[in-house]
Curated annotation (Swiss-Prot):
Subunit structure as annotated in this protein's UniProt entry: Interacts with SpxH.
InterPro entries according to UniProt: SpxO-like (IPR048179)
Name by which UniProt lists this protein: Anti-adapter protein SpxO
Induction or repression: Induced under cell wall stress, but not disulfide stress, and this induction requires the CssRS two-component system, which responds to both secretion stress and cell wall antibiotics. Phosphorylated CssR acts as an anti-repressor by antagonizing YuxN repression.
Biological role: Inhibitor of Spx proteolytic control. Acts by interacting with SpxH/YjbH, which disrupts interaction between SpxH and Spx, and inhibits SpxH-enhanced proteolysis of Spx by ClpXP. Required for the stabilization of Spx and activation of Spx-regulated genes in response to cell wall stress.
Phenotype of the disrupted gene, per the record: Deletion of the gene causes a decrease in the overall Spx levels, as well as a change in the dynamics of Spx accumulation.
Organism: Bacillus subtilis (strain 168)
Length: 54
């Protein structure tokens, strides 16, 4: 997980707020639906190993 930590510290240095989040399984199934949707939906990155990027 060191690569992930380095990437997160680089993002923090650029001023992107990164935090570890826990979300219910309902959100995971919604996320799959979003990926299957043809039109790109603009959302926060809330996808990367439970990290939230805003």
């Amino acid at each position: 997980m060191r690569e992930l930590d380095e990437m997160i510290s680089r993002l923090r240095n650029r001023g992107i707020k990164v935090e570890k989040v826990k979300y219910p399984k309902q959100t995971l199934s919604e996320k799959k639906w979003v990926h299957q949707c043809k039109q790109p939906l603009k959302t926060n990155y809330r996808d990367f190993n439970g990290y939230s990027f805003t």
